Amino acid sequence: MVDVPRLMSTQHPDNATLPFFTAGDVIEGEDEIQEAYYVYSHLGCDEQMWDFEGKEGDEYAVKKLLSRYDEFFADHQLGTDVRLTVRGPNPDVEGSEAKILLEILESIPRSFDAARRFAGEYGLETTAPIFEVIVPMVTDADQLNAVHEYYERFVTGKADEAVWDGRTVEEWVGEFDPASITVIPLIEEREAMLAADDIVREYATAHDQDAVRVFLARSDPALNYGCLAADLINKVALQRLYEMSEATGVDVHPILGAGSAPFRGNLTPERAAATADAYSEVETFTVQSAFKYDYPVETVRDGVATLRDADLGAPPFPIDEARALAVIDRTADAYADQVDAIAGTVNRLSSYVPDRRARKLHVGLFGYAREVGENALPRAIGYTASLYAVGCPPTLLGAHALTDDDAAFVREAFPAYFDHLADAARYFNPRCTDVLDLDDDTLAAAVERVDVTPNSEHRAATDDAIDALQRGDDDALRSAIRRGARERQFLG
C-alpha cells in the first residue's frame, strides 16, 4: 500500500458557519467540487471523502476536478499526491439505495479514463484517481468481500466478454482500469467494532491483502452508547486490531471519524495536538466541516499541519479490556435510560436545526441497537445540535453512572475523556430540565467532575431557545440555535 493519507476531509454537515464558496445555506452539487479543490490546495488535506451514502454525490467529480483545476492537479496528482475516496451505501442495511453502490463501482473505470487523458495531456504517468471504496455500517467481512468481488467479476471482469459477433466489451468501449480496488470498512456498531480485528483478518485473507485501512466511527457509537463508551469501544477495537496485525503480519491503517463536538470526538483545529496524542495509534483523522469552516483559515491550516506532522501509527497504550467493557456497559445503560426520556423532545428540536448539506433520510444504527431501545432519533449531528440548543451537551448523558473507581480507571486509560467533559460542561444550562425530562442531580453529578467556567454568551442563547420552545416561537428558536452554534464553533 502506498503512503496512507493523514487528513480525510469529509462532507459531514456539522458547521455553524457557511464557507465562502457557497451562495445558499446548504453546501451541495458544484460547491462540493470546489470544496475538494479548496481542502487540497489551501488547507493541506491529502484526502477527500466523496460521499454517496445518505446524500447525492457527483459521479463525474474526477473529470470536473481535473478540467477545472488542471494546473493544480498537474503538480499534485490525483490518486498519489492527493486522494478522492468514495463512500457508498451498504446494501445489507440500506436496501432502497443498494444499487447506488453498483453505479459507484461502474463509474471508477470511467474516472480512470478521465485521469488517463489528463495524464497524457500533461506528460504524466497514469495513476488510478479512485481505487478505494468505503462501505459504511459494516458488521462482517462478507459485506467487504461482496464489494471487492463484484468489482473484479462484474465491472472489470466483463472486459473479455463478447457482446456481438466475437467483439469483446473491451474492444467495444476500451479498457477497464484499475483492475481491482480495496474496500475500507466503516465500522459503527459496538459488537462489530469489537470484532474489527476478525473482520479485517477475514477480508485480508480472502483477497491476499497485506495491508487494510479500517475506518472506526466515533459519532454513531456516541449516539448509540454515549460519549465515554464510544471512546472506550474505539480504544479496545484499536488494541485488538494491533494485536491481530502483530500476529498475522497484515498492516492495519486505522482511520478515526471524529467531529468537532466533544460528543463526536472533540477534534478541532485548536485540539489537533491533544487528539493526536489521545489517539496516537490512528493514522488518518477526518477533517469535518466545522473544523474547516468555523475557525479562521490560518487556525485551520495550523491544525491540519499539526495532525500531518504528528507521530501517528504508534502501538496502542495497553487497556484493561474487561474493565473497559464493564464501564462501557454501565455508562451505556445509564445513557440509554436518559435518551428514552428525551427522545420526543430531541426529535421536535431537530426540525429547527439548520441543514448544511443536501442529504437524504439516513437509516442509522440507533433504531437497531438493543442497548438503546427502539427510539427513532435524528442523525448524530442533528441530535447533538438539538441538545446543545437547550444547554444539555450530550457528553453529560450517562456520565453520572461513573463510580469513583471508574473515574480513576478512565483517567489512566483515556484521560482525554475529562477534556471532552470539560469542553462540553461549559455549555451546560441547568434550565435544560425545563424542557427535557432529565434529573437535575444526575446532570450535576456529571458537571461536578470537572471545573469549568460557563460560557455566558452560549447560556444566553440557550435561555432564549428554551423560552422560544416553551412559547412556540419557531423563528426565535431557529435564531437562538444558530447563535449558540456560532458561539461554540460547531453546529452538532
UniProtKB/Swiss-Prot annotation:
Pfam families: PEPcase_2 (PF14010)
SUPFAM superfamilies: Phosphoenolpyruvate/pyruvate domain (SSF51621)
Reaction equation(s) it catalyzes: oxaloacetate + phosphate = phosphoenolpyruvate + hydrogencarbonate
EC number: 4.1.1.31
Keyword tags: Carbon dioxide fixation, Lyase, Magnesium
Keyword Lyase: yes
Top-level taxon of the source organism: Archaea
An annotated GO BP: oxaloacetate metabolic process
InterPro entries: PEP_COase_arc-type (IPR007566), Pyrv/PenolPyrv_kinase-like_dom (IPR015813)
Cofactors named for this entry: Mg(2+)
An example Gene Ontology molecular-function term: magnesium ion binding
NCBIfam families registered for this protein in UniProt: PEPCase_arch
Quaternary structure, from the entry: Homotetramer.
Function per UniProt: Catalyzes the irreversible beta-carboxylation of phosphoenolpyruvate (PEP) to form oxaloacetate (OAA), a four-carbon dicarboxylic acid source for the tricarboxylic acid cycle.
Family assignment from sequence similarity: Belongs to the PEPCase type 2 family.
Protein name as catalogued: Phosphoenolpyruvate carboxylase
Protein source organism: Halobacterium salinarum (strain ATCC 700922 / JCM 11081 / NRC-1) (Halobacterium halobium)
Lineage: Archaea, Methanobacteriati, Methanobacteriota, Stenosarchaea group, Halobacteria
Primary gene name: ppcA
